[in-house]
Amino acid sequence: MKVTGFSFIRNAVNNDYPVVQAILSILPVCDEFVIAVGDCTDNTLELIEGIGSSKIKIIHTVWDESIREGGRTFAQETDKAYAAISKDTDWAFYIQGDECVHENYLPVIKNAMEENLNNENVEGLLFKYLHFYGSYDFIASSRRWYRNEVRVLKFDPGVHSYRDAQGFRKNGRKIKVKPIEAYIYHYGWVQPPAGLGNKVRNFNKFYHEDSWIQEHLPENIEFDYGNADRLIRFEGTHPQVMQKRIEVSNWKFQVDPTLMKKKMSLRRRILQKIEDMSQWRIGEYKNYKTVQ
């Protein structure tokens, strides 16, 4: 069984993406790892090269900045990395530059790959998500935040990244996936206000025209943490690869989590209550088809 990790990145230093930690978090279960490094204006390439693993294959890409709709550039870059995967690969393991997998889940993931390798009804594995927000001590948990996503796929030429690289399609249809008891730790919203404001501004350049950016996200904007709906204190442990990064974090998260929930509309509070009691999220968008 051959497993290949794949991802894409550009300007990880400027945007403070933990891409090295992302790669290292799944590298133990990968036989190779393909990373598409875009046309950076910082030392992202040197950062990736510094990992120093023979498993890592770097491909150089140029991002299409003319596409200002739906984040489709992210899907294009994902597809470039996917296309460079060795053809004898059985499973492709996708990780984005602000995601990590806890080492405790690696045996679960590997076992699921082995158990479903010859199951033609399973085309991918579905992960649960923890969205860290503002601080490494809190996770955002509400209808605003997606609960699951596909991160492991059976390698097939018919698979392509979908929309803004949040999910995948196979020959234009949803992928059949098996849910597993493993989490993706999403750290994209853990930065100080100024840094996160800069990241959000750069990110939105792939969704909106410059005029919209200037109006809604002016330069030097500080991010407003007050729109998460609901924060829950995280009582678990972080991946080992994240420990040093967490230790050097030097900002104070000063948002009162109890005030966020009060901002939710009555409708959202009712829907959230139903979900909390039943685990049923009414109207949930699912970019996949679950199978057992």
PLM region descriptions:
Residues 96-100:
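The conserved acidic donor/metal-binding loop of glycosyltransferases
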Residues 3-11, 16-21, 37-94:
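Active-site-proximal specificity loops/subdomain of glycosyltransferases
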Residues 23, 52, 109-113:
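Glycine-rich, phosphate-binding/catalytic loops in enzymes
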Residues 28, 51-53, 87, 119-120, ...:
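Short, well-ordered coil/turn elements that cap or connect secondary structure elements
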Residues 74-79, 102-292:
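Catalytic-site signature of metal-activated, phosphate-bearing donor transferases
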Residues 2-7, 26, 32-35, 184:
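Hydrophobic targeting segments
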Residues 33-34, 92, 125:
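Hydrophobic residues within beta-strands of alpha/beta enzymes
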